A protein has these predicted regions:
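The feature captures the beta-strand-to-loop junction immediately N-terminal to the Walker
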Residues: 33-35
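ABC ATPase NBD Q-loop/coupling interface
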Residues: 59-75, 139
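Q-loop/switch helix immediately C-terminal to the Walker
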Residues: 86, 92-106, 119
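ABC ATPase C-loop
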Residues: 155-156
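Walker B catalytic motif
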Residues: 167-168
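Helical segment within the ABC ATPase nucleotide-binding domain
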Residues: 177-190
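H-loop/switch region of ABC-family ATPase nucleotide-binding domains
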Residues: 197-199
Length: 202
């Protein structure tokens, strides 16, 4: 599914990734653990195509296709997803409208708002989110736990082939960890891959 070969990447002329090799097959969950500053989030961003980082050497192969030079939106259309460590707030854009736009771009299907609400209702219930959660502006005024639940909600609705979770477990209390963990477990299937980034040694 995903194969990273001798990946070197830098930002502002400073090399951060120095020859990373990784292979993820369908149905597998891989964890990248390490202290802050060790390059875990850099790897997640480089795999997803963040233009801030420059790949100086190596290749990223997804489902047999070399995507090393592909932009972020193309990777999303191929079925890749990144749950951010620090999700941004977007005032004026509701969660349901963001999901509607994302699905339209990825699947080339024009969902109505009603169709989208039906699609997200079950996932919201599983994550312990209230019915009006989808009408809130994206991450505006959200607690840390709500931001992480929103990332998992996006994961559930967008249903990618490969999900990269960048420290989705950080900053959560015990209940938040349980809800997010259960949400990810329910989404895991034999045809999907997961790359989990964490600084927790567990």
């Amino acid at each position: 599914m995903l194969e990273i070969k001798n990946l070197h990447a830098e930002v502002d002329g400073v090399e951060i990734l120095k020859g990373v090799d990784l292979k993820i097959n369908p149905g597998e969950v891989h964890a990248i653990m390490g202290p802050n500053g060790s390059g875990k989030s850099t790897l997640a961003n480089v795999v997803m195509g963040n233009p801030v980082y420059e790949i100086s050497k190596g290749n990223i192969i997804f489902e047999g296709e070399d995507i090393t030079e592909e932009p972020v939106d193309n990777r999303a259309k191929l079925g890749m997803f990144l749950a951010f460590q620090y999700p941004e707030s977007i005032p004026g854009v509701t969660i349901v409208n963001m999901l509607k736009t994302a699905l339209t771009n990825i699947e080339d299907i024009e969902y109505t708002t009603v169709e989208l609400r039906l699609k997200v209702a079950e996932s919201m219930e599983q994550l312990g989110l209230s019915a009006d959660f989808a009408d809130r502006y994206l991450n505006e005024g959200f607690s840390g736990g709500e931001r992480k639940r929103n990332e998992i909600l996006q994961l559930a609705v967008l249903d990618p082939k490969l999900a990269i979770l960048d420290e989705t477990d950080s900053g959560l209390d015990v209940d938040g960890l349980r809800v997010v963990g259960e949400g990810v477990s329910k989404l895991k299937t034999d045809d999907k891959g997961y790359l989990v980034v964490t600084h927790y040694q567990r």
